Amino acid sequence: MAEVESRLLNCFATAFPELAPQEIPSVSMGSLGSWDSLAGITLLSLIEEEFGIGISPDDAAGLLSFELILDYLRQLPAEAAE
């Protein structure tokens, strides 16, 4: 598993401890009842801290699933995701 994906899995596991590890890669805001606006802010804060990045409000509005967030992180310059 790629390092970025592994680190993102850890962020999700912290924000949503009720999820089994194998559930995380397929989770989205629409599929997880506990992913409300507060949980979303918490998740994005964890991601910003873990990856040392800032996520703009415009970008955050589209980050509605594990897969979309992973794609977003993979598009960052390599040094930003280290």
Task: Locate predicted features.
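Phosphopantetheine-dependent thiolation modules in NRPS/PKS and related acyl-activating systems
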Residues: 1-82
